[in-house]
Structures are given as structure tokens and as C-alpha cells.
């Protein structure tokens, strides 16, 4: 199936998509999940930086641990495990959790901390294109979600630090000399977390 990434991004932002003369409205909640093969890229093209910036977070899965691999094999001995999937939440409940998560308080010192971190990415000598304001907003949203998942109604500096790399690594466009020195986006961001002072008092 051929998928127009621009159309998916448009649908994500504008809540509708057009196909020929028809317009389809999407219902909330709506999320776009994409996979990327770390090895083969024949016949594919990298997403433009502007479209990568629309994805809130990128996770690197790697291989599952030994026990998980055994469970994968065990679960597929008889039936397809997908037949055992059950609904655990309604769309309405999920939307309410999203609303509650975004109502979590984030104090000004933390907003300034996020801004200092993202500005530092733009000034880094190994970075050609740093984290955008949209990326900074994504850091705030993810930090609030983490605080909510930990049962708090306020964000702590460790919430920001915990999500910073996963939210920002795919948004960095590194200079060629970064590849020469074998420096990754995660390396750059890890260094900035050590260099940029976190707020002492919230």
C-alpha cells in the first residue's frame, strides 16, 4: 500500500483528510505510529525534517531480552496471540486521561529549563538544526504525561530529563563531523543534560 505521509500529517493536524473529491473526518483519539528499519533503506526515502518534527517521540526498541523472546515463541505455539487482545479502555476514558495529564502544573523555572535545553541544541557545534519550538512543546507535554503517570499533579526536573532524549533525538540534524567522530543525537542530548543547569527550586 502506498501511503502519502503528507496526507497522514495533514490528517493528524487538521482532523480530516481528502481523497479525490471526498473528505473524511477522523475521530479522536488519533495517533500515527511509524516504524523505521535501522538497516535496509532500498526503495525508501527519509522523511523531511519538517515531517519528523511532527512526531512527538521516537523509541529505539532493540532486541527483546531472553525471557521475552521465549514468551514470543511460546505464545505462538497454538493460537495467534492477537486473538486474545481485549479492550482495556474506552476512547472517552483515554481522552479524559489525556486532558488530565495536560492539566498537570509546570512551573516557570521548568519552562525556562526546557527553553535553555532546546536553545543549547541550536548552538551546539555538531548540530546543524536544533530542536524547534514545536519540539519544546512536545517535551513539556511528555513531561506532564510522565508526572501524571507517576501520580503527581506537578512536573519535576527529572520528568523533563527522563523524556528529553526520546522526544528530541529525531529532531536534531547533525553536522557531517558528528558522523566522523561517531557522535549520535543521543550523545549530544546526554551531554546537554549534564551541561545545562536544572532548576534547584520549583
Question: Where in this protein do the model-derived segments appear?
Answer:
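C-terminal engagement/docking regions of AAA+ P-loop ATPases
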Residues: 123-202
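Non-catalytic accessory segments flanking P-loop/AAA+ NTPase cores
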Residues: 63-67, 71-74, 81-84, 102-106, ...
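Canonical AAA+ ATPase core
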Residues: 18-104, 144-146
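Conserved AAA+ ATPase small/helical "lid" subdomain
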Residues: 84-139
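N-terminal low-complexity segments that are often proline-rich with Ser/Thr-Pro
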Residues: 1-17
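Hydrophobic aliphatic residues
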Residues: 14, 51, 73-77, 118, ...
